[in-house]
């Protein structure tokens, strides 16, 4: 067996209830994305080369976009990808952002399945 090293990290969040449940219970439909951020930050360590996140909207209408991804390089990649996602929401009013139905139909990264990846260079060759 090989000795343990800092390998790449993976985090996944699968929401089992509709986004409206999380809006009502926690005050935001972004509950899954917030949990993914927290899980990725807990894995954040030195040697990080980059990170990425993906989201799947399982309730998307036929023909509409249902998969989203964002990637970044560098030691602050986690902050960068989540900041980029938040910038996509700046053109929407707070009423639109708090409307679960609007969010799920129109906003990127509004979905039920999230996955994050952290890439490390301390495991060997890049």
Predicted feature descriptions by range:
Residues 1-126:
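N-terminal glutamine amidotransferase
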